[in-house]
Amino acid sequence: MQRTTKHFQINALALAIAMSTISAHAETDQQTSEYGTLPTIKVKAGSGEENEKSYIAGKTETAVPLGLSVREVPQSVSVITQQRLQDQQLSTLVEVAENVTGVSVNRYETNRGGIYSRGFVVDNYIIDGIPTTYSLPWSSGEIFSSMALYDHIDIVRGATGLTFGAGNPSAAINMVRKRATSTEPTANVEVSAGSWDNYRVMGDIANSLNQSGTVRGRAVAQYEQGDSYTNLLSKEKLSLLLSAEADLSENTLLSGGVTYQEDDPRGPMWGGLPVWFSDGTKTNWSKNTTTSADWTRWNVKYTNLFADLTHKFNDSWSAKLSYSHGKRDANSKLLYVSGSVDKNTGLGLSPYASAYDLEVEQDNASLQLNGSFDLWGLEQKVVLGYQYSNQDFTAYARSTDTKMEIGNFFEWNGSMPEPVWNAPTLNEKYNIEQNALFAATYLNPIEPLKFILGGRFTNYEKNIYGRNSSIKYDHEFVPYAGVIYDFNDVYTAYASYTSIFQPQDNKDFDGNYLDPVEGNSTEVGLKSAWFDGRLNGTLALYHIKQDNLAQEAGQVTRNGVKEIYYRAAKGATSEGFEVEVSGQITPDWNITAGYSQFSAKDANDADVNTQLPRKMIQTFTTYKLPGKLENITVGGGVNWQSSTYVNAKNPKKVIEKIEQGDYALVNLMARYQITKDFSAQLNINNVFNKKYYGVFPAYGQITLGAPRNAALTLQYKF
């Protein structure tokens, strides 16, 4: 793993040159534009970016694009601020999700997993309000992407079909990029070293690019590499951001940039570890056990070009034109192992190798008009919008005729020769085109009462190559309705309703795509804002009903390649509640704490998605010590989840439960502010070294979770 590829070196050099260009203006550019100067660490500005040094949420556009506060949105909203990302050292999206109220993660492989909320999978991943190229059946570790390029993360639980088309009732995750807002030279440099020889370095530089401060730039680069508690597994990651903003006039802002992310794991597991020995007794593997080989890899590259033009007509009306182009390439060579191990000889496992080349390109364009007007003596708000997206998806697979053997698995070290690969064959190719019109209004007829009414008309067409077939849905309407009532300055009650319509990428046993998920979602709740809005609380109760919900049903081989197939669950329902408190109790005390609980069943009253915990607690808090110890901040948290299970056939062909008991992970941190600009921070995760695992329902296999680990981070801001 002690390697740095030439490709990584070239990209890092290019970004270093760009960052040097920005910092070269530091001696002269001290002006401030009308869009504001960033605070002390110079990484935040504008209503969308989060307050420094706190867990206080700002305004959000993720649920309803009206620039509302969290309290004004009639849905459950969690915001992971930049300060919380730093306090917990949440470096990937999956780590963020594991620490969000009502959200769970099932890491079913070392480099893949699923994020879930309210009993259903989350597949609505958004960057700055624009959907990404994510495809669940062909996921390549996207949820393990770096958070270095993002200022904060918005998570809206429940359906967001009004703004993003996909009416998935689980959640939407919106990653908000760092912006080029600073008119003064600012920088943030971090160096981190952790368990299993993990090392990371990050640089974040921003400055004005002209004397007047009307043109600003920002560059972020992060490189990391390291090994793992899992044998053979190593990683190498590169994340880059170049962005700029220009004030074309007092009322017109042009912004744009490019991001590049590359993840290059070696030795990833494909599938998990067998649960049973061949005699039917349970296995108990050590935490470093792997089924991978030393030639396996899973390289993923994602490039995103983006541009926004915002014009403010007056104090009440504005328009925004946005465009983005995303391209994801994934190239893998993988080894899957099936069967069960003989307890005495170690024999019994069968290897299966396959390689994949995946390319996804997506263009998105949108036009949005926001306005406000006076009616009944109070301010009302309205938004009108059009969205267009076009995605091309191509996947090639390579099989092998090379004979392979695992031998005695107790002696397995991954030193199997790489097989000879056959020529690539087209596995799947399609194009998805969508366009939609949406509108919503925020009506305030009397002071304490507000209504949000809106809807979205969507056209969807998927053309599948090789089958000469297409799937088309025209003028599908998704309504949205919400009501908010302010009892006083502290407490607000709300209710919301939306329908669900979501085409699927999942296939049945015969290779046919499942029909769209359809249904509705209802939510009621109470929100509060204590300490002048510094501490926010939410109590939410919800009921969801869906038809055609995809459930993993088993494995099937198509064109020599193994795939998971799904069945559609009719009449699936989920109902539950969530409680969350997040923000600042005092300027020195940040806290987030949440409890969630749900029940999900199909029409036959059978539990669905049983691999998900029905009850969860997620907490974390930090406190800056007083007096002579004021340079020290300490913190910690607990993530607890109830037991989970899946039913699978054991070696005797009898259905048996694979059960994970309830468990809690304790995480601690401490930071010492050495000088005003220089700090050292220690994070320890899974303090009590709890053993736990994720499960792959279709395969009946498990992947062990991370044991106790630690990281030391040095940060210098100037």
Descriptions of predicted regions:
Residues D247, V360, E379-Q391, E428-Q546, ...:
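Structural signature of Gram-negative outer-membrane beta-barrels, strongest in the C-terminal barrel
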Residues T133-Y134, L149-D151, L162-L240, L248-T252, ...:
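Outer-membrane beta-barrel translocator/receptor signature
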Residues D308-S324, R328-L334, E518-Q584, I591, ...:
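Membrane-embedded beta-barrel scaffold of Gram-negative outer-membrane proteins
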Residues E224-S228, L241-K312, K327-V360, K403-L426, ...:
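Acidic/polar loop-and-plug regions of large Gram-negative outer-membrane beta-barrel proteins
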Residues V105, I130-R157, V176-R177:
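Short acidic/polar hinge/loop motifs at secondary-structure boundaries
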Residues E447-P448, H543, R567-K649, F688, ...:
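Gram-negative outer-membrane beta-barrel transporters
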